[in-house]
């Protein structure tokens, strides 16, 4: 129930990861089930899982709508908001969960994570995370970085905007995915399109360790 970058972060935190997506993911590095994630949650025995991460499609909420409209004569299309039904199902299941989405998504009491709060990340990539357990944010505060808009090269301290499929000033087509992967924290197994949507593994490694601490505490108290 989570994306490729998110999965790597949870793996680093100590989880055994199973990914579920309705779209085939040939580059996914862990066990994978090709199926609608919501249907999977509704119909499968989840007793073997200790926690669930969900990344519902972000197209209904992303600020990249403006970029897409500009390239498609003002057209963007309809995109359903899957967050409410995802939350409803996860609350019924009752296991610790995290729902991730973009800035502007209707998450309830989310925390926000930024690239500048972590070492060795060179993109801000703000993401929101909702949970049914208390999540802490990093002790390092977010630092504003002067980052050019998508396609316009490097900004302060090498920070770059990672999105879209157009050219990037200062890089050729082979260099773009290499630097994007580097900027996201060392991702070297994704395509450019996958990198454009990836969560930095550092985010979910940070959150995954909190999930593991919570799970251990519940077991000790049980």
Predicted features, each with a name:
Residues 1-8:
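Glycine-rich SAM-binding Motif I of class I
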Residues 11:
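Gly/Ala-rich phosphate-binding loop of Rossmann-like dinucleotide-binding domains
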Residues 15-21:
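Conserved SAM-binding motif I beta-strand of class I
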Residues 21, 31-34, 40-52, 58-218:
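Class I S-adenosyl-L-methionine
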């Amino acid at each position: 129930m989570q994306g490729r970058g998110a999965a790597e972060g949870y793996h680093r935190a100590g989880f055994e990861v199973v990914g579920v997506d309705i779209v085939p993911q040939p580059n996914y590095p862990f066990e994978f089930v090709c199926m609608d994630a919501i249907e999977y949650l509704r119909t499968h025995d989840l007793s073997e899982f200790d926690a669930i991460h969900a990344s519902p499609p972000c197209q209904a909420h992303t600020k990249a709508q403006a970029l897409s409209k500009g390239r498609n004569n003002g057209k963007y299309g309809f995109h359903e908001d899957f967050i409410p039904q995802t939350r409803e199902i996860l609350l019924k299941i009752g296991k610790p969960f995290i729902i991730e989405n973009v800035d502007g998504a209707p998450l309830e009491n989310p925390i926000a994570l930024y690239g500048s709060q972590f070492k060795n990340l060179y993109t801000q990539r703000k993401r929101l995370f909702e949970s049914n357990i208390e999540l802490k944010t990093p002790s390092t505060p977010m630092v504003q970085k002067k980052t050019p808009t998508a396609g316009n090269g490097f900004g302060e301290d090498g920070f770059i905007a990672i999105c879209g499929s157009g050219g990037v000033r200062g890089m050729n087509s082979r260099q773009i995915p290499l630097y994007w992967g580097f900027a996201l924290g060392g991702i070297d197994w994704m395509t450019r399109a996958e990198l454009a949507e990836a969560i930095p593994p550092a985010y979910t490694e940070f959150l995954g360790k909190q999930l593991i601490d919570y799970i251990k505490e519940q077991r000790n108290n049980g």
